[in-house]
Structures are given as C-alpha cells and as structure tokens.
C-alpha cells in the first residue's frame, strides 16, 4: 500500500464473482476475484505493449489429429491464479478491494502498487505468457513459429506438445506418468492442477 499521491493514475477495480463448472455442467467451485478495470488505464502511463498469444482453434484440431495418429494422449493442466504469478512489468496502481480499505492518518485511502499481475489489467496476459514462456524455454521446450502458443519437447519419454490458452494447458504425451512429471515441473514454478485425460477441450468434445 502506498499514498495516493505517488500514483500518476489510479486504476479502479471491482469484485467479479463466477461459478466455475465442470465439462458435464456440474458446479466445480464458486470464485470471487478482485479485478482491475482496464478501461481506466492510460496508455504510455499504465501500459505500452499488451498483445499475448493464445492457441488457435485450428491448431488445437491439428494437435489432436497428430495425437490420434501417433498414439499420444491429451491431458489438461490449469494454473491457479495465473496472472498473479507473473511479475508486473509496469508501475501500476489500483484502488484497494472494496470492503478492505486502509486509510492514512489524514483519512485518505491508500492505493495498491502492483508487484504481480492482476486480472483486468491490459498487460496481465502478456506478462503471464512471458513468465510461462521463460520457464518452458529454460526447461528445453521449443516454441513453434507457426503458432507461438505451441511448444514441443523431445526426450526419453518421446515427443510431447503443449497448447497454451491463457492459464489452460493442453499436454499431449504418451502416458499419465509423463503428464504427472510435467505437472510436477509446473508446480515447481506455478501452482498447477492436473485435469487428467481430456474429453472436452476449449468447448470441443
């Protein structure tokens, strides 16, 4: 928390509540998240570059066809609060979450200076992809030029592929044990949950 006077622009925020459902429509959990209102950001003050790639649907279909041809299995992994795992590359100031406001001695509310990404900011997706990409490349994964959200790795366990859609990861590999090893790698960097073998991928069954 910092005094409001230190912030060239204060980004407003809001609580976003959501019901996350499983592929069969049943409720998995209820979520509440404090998000920035990105429309209140000012260009060249709060952000400059904002583009972040996500895997194309045509690439997903191509990966699944390749998996079927080479007997690979599609597994899923989900990174918990992904945007908050990446360092914030800009100086961003956001108002405090409503209901949890702290004031200075003069009665003025402090503002939050972000150290990590926050959902709703324009560059959060870019910062997250940059952080994930750095970890994957360091581990030997190769980013594909045709679709920068696809990565591959050749090793003793055979060829593996990743398809990245924000915080959802499609992992093609030969067995559950290989997938578990990948999830362990992810957990050493970001809290990650395995979704097991997939039958429902980005709206496609």
State what each model feature region is:
Residues 1-205:
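Long, low-complexity, charge-biased intrinsically disordered regions
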């Amino acid at each position: 928390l910092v005094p409001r006077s230190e912030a060239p622009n204060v980004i407003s925020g809001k609580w976003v509540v959501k019901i996350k459902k499983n592929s069969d429509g049943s409720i998995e959990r209820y979520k509440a998240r404090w998000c920035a209102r990105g429309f209140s950001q000012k260009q060249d003050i709060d952000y400059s570059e904002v583009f972040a790639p996500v895997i194309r649907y045509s690439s997903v279909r191509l990966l699944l066809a390749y998996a079927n041809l080479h007997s690979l299995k599609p597994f899923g992994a989900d990174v918990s609060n992904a945007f908050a795992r990446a360092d914030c590359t800009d100086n961003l100031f956001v108002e405090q979450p409503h209901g949890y406001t702290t004031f200075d001695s003069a009665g003025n509310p402090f503002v939050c200076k972000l150290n990590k990404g926050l959902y709703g900011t324009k560059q959060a997706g870019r910062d997250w992809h940059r952080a994930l990409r750095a970890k994957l490349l360091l581990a030997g994964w190769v980013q594909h030029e045709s679709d920068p959200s696809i990565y591959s790795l050749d090793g003793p366990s055979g060829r593996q592929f990743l398809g990245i859609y924000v915080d959802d990861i499609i992992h093609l590999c030969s067995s559950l044990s290989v997938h578990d090893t990948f999830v362990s790698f992810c957990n050493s960097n970001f809290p990650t949950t395995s979704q097991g073998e997939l039958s429902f991928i980005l709206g496609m069954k």
